[in-house]
Amino acid sequence: MFLGTHSPRLDEKGRIILPAKFREELASGLVLTRGQERCIYVFSEKEFARVHEQMREAPISSKQARDYIRVFLSGASDEVPDKQGRVTIPPALREYAGLGRELAVIGAGSRAEIWDAQAWNEYLAEKETAFSETDDPIPGIL
C-alpha cells in the first residue's frame, strides 16, 4: 500500500528517486500513466494488470469508456527502476503533469501519484477545507 507524501526532485535527465517505502513494491517494474487532475499515476505491474482487466470489462459501445481507456492507456509507459531506485519519467508525461524540478510523490493506497510540488500544494489547500467539513457518507469510503 502506498502512503504518505514525499518530496523528491526531478534530475536533469528526467528521473526521480522513488521513495524508499515504495521501492520494494515497484522494484520489478511499474507503469506510469496520465492521472486525473494533471498528475502521473504510478502503478505496480500487478496493480496495473488488475486495473486493465477492469477496463476490459467496460462495454465497447460506451463512448465514455472508450475515451477514458484511450487517454489512460495511450499515455502509459512501463519502466523498471535502476539499482539506486531511480525511474525516468517520459517527456510527454512530464509535460502533461507540468512537472518542474520540485515534486510531490503521494501515496494513494493502490497507487502513487507524482505531482509538481506547487500544483500539489495548491490542490491540497483547495481540497483540505472540503475534506475537514465532510460529514455526508462518501460511497465506498465513509
Curated annotation (Swiss-Prot):
This is Transcriptional regulator MraZ. Keywords: Cytoplasm, DNA-binding, Repeat, Transcription, Transcription regulation. Belongs to the MraZ family. It is found in: Cytoplasm, Nucleoid. One of its GO terms (cellular component) is nucleoid. The keyword Transcription regulation applies. Pfam families: MraZ. Forms oligomers. Residues 5-47, 76-119 form the SpoVT-AbrB domain. Its main location: cytoplasm. GO terms for molecular function: DNA-binding transcription factor activity; transcription cis-regulatory region binding. GO terms for biological process: negative regulation of DNA-templated transcription initiation. SUPFAM superfamilies: AbrB/MazE/MraZ-like (SSF89447). It comes from Pseudarthrobacter chlorophenolicus (strain ATCC 700700 / DSM 12829 / CIP 107037 / JCM 12360 / KCTC 9906 / NCIMB 13794 / A6). NCBIfam families: division/cell wall cluster transcriptional repressor MraZ. The keyword Acetylation does not apply. Transmembrane segments: none annotated. InterPro entries: MraZ, MraZ_C, MraZ_dom, MraZ_N, MraZ_sf, SpoVT-AbrB_dom, SpoVT-AbrB_sf.
